């Protein structure tokens, strides 16, 4: 049909038959106050200003008050940014040929960041849910995109007779990771189908999002946060593909 042809043109035309294949990696982490109190967002904002000189990054985006919220390395194109809230830091790495080279750069960034945060008794921690989520304000970064997201999630309070959870602010305290792989026109369907089949296994093997605010009895509460929120109002927005694709 005409609509299918348009979709194929939109999404498949940019797939290049290139022997050079790259990987893209994004990692999100909470920044916690090691005394168990709320994260001091001023500490994190100061960290971003510090990283500009410490790691030779440049400021790519600022919030409504001029505070740097996204930094980029002009050579590697690695970015360090706030993800939704000032208590979550994301590392969005530029394209790389191997995971190992990303790991090498990540280690350099983490060493500098953890050393600076330690001066204020804060640290990046490897949790899928911010350990002090109930102490933090859980407000969005002062930037239109993040305010829009949080406003949308808060619409759940207007949805009656539903099974939506009561934590619309979850966008400010959950973390995740993403990996993007280059594909070709000859293998993209095989890659999509492969990830569809391993996704549920992967989520259990690497589960680290246990939530203390509800009796959910799972270490992958991220699924509940997404599926039983405004994101899950439309089933197509959550979960994995319902079937394997042949064409």
Locate each region found by the language model.
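Terminal catalytic/cofactor-binding subdomain
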Residues: 1-167, 173
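Loop-rich catalytic cores of soluble enzymes, especially ATP-dependent carboxylate-amine ligases
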Residues: 124-247
